[in-house]
From Swiss-Prot:
The gene is xpt. Converts the preformed base xanthine, a product of nucleic acid breakdown, to xanthosine 5'-monophosphate (XMP), so it can be reused for RNA or DNA synthesis. Its EC number is 2.4.2.22. This is Xanthine phosphoribosyltransferase. It comes from the Bacteria. It comes from Lactobacillus helveticus (strain DPC 4571). Pathway: Purine metabolism; XMP biosynthesis via salvage pathway; XMP from xanthine: step 1/1.
């Protein structure tokens, strides 16, 4: 998605450790118009799929997830990184390692929000090593849902997460695919 790539070139910052900082429009401050366009693009890319619900992970997956759900006219569920005190019902759990924060999280979704046989579209802000996606796939399988695809706003294809998704037979689409960071610059690829 050229608009997104241009925004990354303009406002993104490559940090040590192959980290891309895009806090000005996705990971801290959100550009709702850009996120709406991302949602529209995911709708186009997954148009051949019957989608009952969007599944994402808090916190940065919520903006693209809710916009995608909005344009698809379906609900969105987000996996929580901590079980809140208000959640007394049964939950599905999965372990997720955060690449940027270097911590292990246990993500959870209340069981009654996912139903056997539902068709889920997983949306995430970044797919790097794919840890959050792996956790959401795990939760979807526990709930006996069908995963119709995985959409990433940004995929760092050189870190293996997008390969993992494809190797598991899942339809994968990235709105911006990054092949490498060289000399502090983002180098985009064409592969989804």
């Amino acid at each position: 998605m050229k608009l997104l790539e241009d925004r990354i070139k303009k406002d993104g910052e490559v940090l040590d450790g192959d980290v891309l900082k895009i806090n000005s429009f996705l990971n801290h401050q959100v550009d709702p118009q850009l996120m709406m366009q991302c949602g529209e693009e995911f709708k186009r890319l997954f148009a051949d799929q019957k989608i009952d619900k969007v599944l994402t992970c808090e916190a940065s997956g919520i903006a693209p997830g809710v916009m995608t759900a909005y344009v698809l006219d379906v609900p969105m569920v987000f996996a929580r990184k901590k079980k809140p005190s208000t959640l007394n019902d049964a939950v599905y759990w999965a372990d997720v390692f955060s690449y940027t924060k270097k911590v292990n999280n246990k993500i959870c979704v209340e069981e009654k929000l996912l139903h056997k046989g539902e068709n889920l579209l997983i949306i995430d802000d970044f797919v790097a090593q794919g840890e959050a996606v792996k956790g959401m796939v795990n939760i979807a399988k526990q709930a006996e849902c069908n995963i119709v695809g995985v959409g990433a706003v940004v995929a760092k294809t050189f870190q293996g997460g997008s390969d993992w998704v494809k190797q598991h037979g899942l339809h994968f689409e990235a709105l911006a695919s990054i092949d490498s960071f060289k000399d502090g610059q983002v180098h985009f690829g064409k592969e989804n």
